[in-house]
Structures are given as structure tokens and as C-alpha cells.
Amino acid sequence: MINGSIVALITPMNSDGSVDFASLERLVEFHIDQGTDAIVAVGTTGESATLPMNEHVTVVAQTVKFAAGRIPVIGGNGANATAEAIELTKSLSKVGVAAMLGVTPYYNKPTPKGLVAHYKAVAASTDIPQILYNVPGRTAVDMKPETVAELVSVSNIIGVKEATGDVSRVKRLRELCGNDFMLYSGDDATASEFLLLGGNGVISVANNIVPKAFKAMCDAALAGNAELAASIDEPLRGLYSTLFCEANPIPVKWAAHRMGLIECGHIRLPLTELSEQCHGLLLEAMTRAQIEVK
């Protein structure tokens, strides 16, 4: 099973808006070198909402190619139409992903019954392991632990990314879903506590720019060493808030560009590049986290 420190990878782009595959390859190598445990390709942070399906699949496939079996790649397969999610899932099943991460259908606000039917239909279209993804701040639907529990019996649904920031859900999910069901935090600010309470891993935005420290924090928390985890986490806490001073992934792409990790900080409309009033805040947080800016 995939656990530990997982990066919600940005999708680097050229100034004309095309995907920058050279920078993508460098990012994959960077995370392998820094010890990241797995990569999520084309999730929310990877701008899945603005990549058409053919491009989405290509970016995931290239990420798998660059990884070359050295690090697991999880492909984002979320959509707010079940038929579209199934089509995407079938395509991703052919490119070598280790698992897929499917966000709850957004905007159309399905009921719990609809969520269960959606995920069962998507899971039935593939043998690849599926990870549920609950992020109500973006989707306008909250998949409660009781709904997640209805999907545990589906053999290839292996876990959930829980991004509400409500760490009390760890205990409830464990009670309802059992010890073999994988629980991933999707909230950097509460990730350490999530792991200490029994979570298995973190799918992180900040991990894009502080992978070595984030990996060390995750390892400490998974080992039950709360004091060490807190000491590693403390210098990073400013990042956890300032990386959301504007909509993700605007700030993290700007930061990655300032670090020289990507050639260009371009982001696709309707998102725009980081506003100047956030530059100082983010630079200050990066300095505190001991990030070198070029």
C-alpha cells in the first residue's frame, strides 16, 4: 500500500500555456531524490480542472514514464459526470498508474446515495486501486465517514483522502472502515496530528517545495514521535497558510518558479498568477522554512 509523504504535484507550463514536460521530468527527479513516497499527477494541484481529457491522460502517462518504476504515481480520475470519470479511468488504466484518486463530483452536489453509486460505477470500470477524495471546500459536497463506509466492501476502493481538516474524522473512519482502509490527509496544517491519530499518509501541496522536511515530519508522526514531528513541522507552518493566500495552486507554482524548480509560473485561466500583495508573505514563509530562492 502507498503511505507516507505524497506530493500533489503541480503541472508546469510554458508561457504559452502548453505543458512544460522538461520541467515535469525535473520535478519527478527532484521528488525521487528528496525521498517523497509517491506522486499524485493531475489532481487539484495539478490543474485537473483546466486540462482536457487527452492532455490530462498524457501528463499522467509522461509522469509514469519519467518515474520509471522508482516512485508510485497516482493518477487523478475525478469528474462531476460519472460517465466522464469512467472514460478517464479506463484511459488511465492503460498508462501504468499505481492507483487513482477520484474527487467527489463537484457542483452538481450528489446525495450520499449518488456518491456511493458514482464510486461503485467508477471502480467497476478498472482493476486499479481507487482512492476516494473528500474536499467539500471545493466541491460543495461533504462525503461523511458513514458514506465512505458503504464503499469499503468494494475490493479496489482502498482508501480516502480526507481534506476537511477535521482530524476527529480519523477515529470515526477507523471505527467504520477498519484498520486496512487507507486514510490520507489532504490538509497540510493538520497532517501531523492526522498521522499521529492513525492516518497512513498525506497528499500534500507544501510537499512540492519542502519535500525532504515534509517526508521527515511524516516519518516521525507515523513512528508515533509527536515531539520530533512537531519540531520539524513548526518552521513549515507559515507555508501551510500562505500557500493558500490565493487559490491553490497559484501560490505553490509561484514559489516553485522562484526556487528554480520550474521554468515558468504560468497557470491556466480562470486562475491567474499570484498577486503582488502575496509575494512578500510567501517569501517570508519560504525564508522561515529555509527555502532558497533564486
Swiss-Prot record:
Pfam families: DHDPS
UniProt GO cellular component terms: cytosol
Enzyme class: lyase
Catalytic reaction equation(s): L-aspartate 4-semialdehyde + pyruvate = (2S,4S)-4-hydroxy-2,3,4,5-tetrahydrodipicolinate + H2O + H(+)
Enzyme Commission number(s) from the entry: 4.3.3.7
Any one GO molecular function term: 4-hydroxy-tetrahydrodipicolinate synthase activity
Pathway(s) it belongs to: Amino-acid biosynthesis; L-lysine biosynthesis via DAP pathway; (S)-tetrahydrodipicolinate from L-aspartate: step 3/4
Active site (UniProt): 133, 161
Site-annotated residues for Part of a proton relay during catalysis: 44, 107
UniProt keyword annotations, A-Z: Amino-acid biosynthesis, Cytoplasm, Diaminopimelate biosynthesis, Lyase, Lysine biosynthesis, Schiff base
GO terms under biological process: diaminopimelate biosynthetic process; lysine biosynthetic process via diaminopimelate
InterPro entries: Aldolase_TIM, DapA, DapA-like, Schiff_base-form_aldolases_AS, Schiff_base-form_aldolases_CS
Binding locations of pyruvate: 45, 203
Gene3D superfamilies, sorted: Aldolase class I
Domain of life: Bacteria
Cellular compartments annotated: Cytoplasm
Function: Catalyzes the condensation of (S)-aspartate-beta-semialdehyde [(S)-ASA] and pyruvate to 4-hydroxy-tetrahydrodipicolinate (HTPA).
Subunit structure: Homotetramer; dimer of dimers.
Protein family membership: Belongs to the DapA family.
Identification of the protein by name: 4-hydroxy-tetrahydrodipicolinate synthase
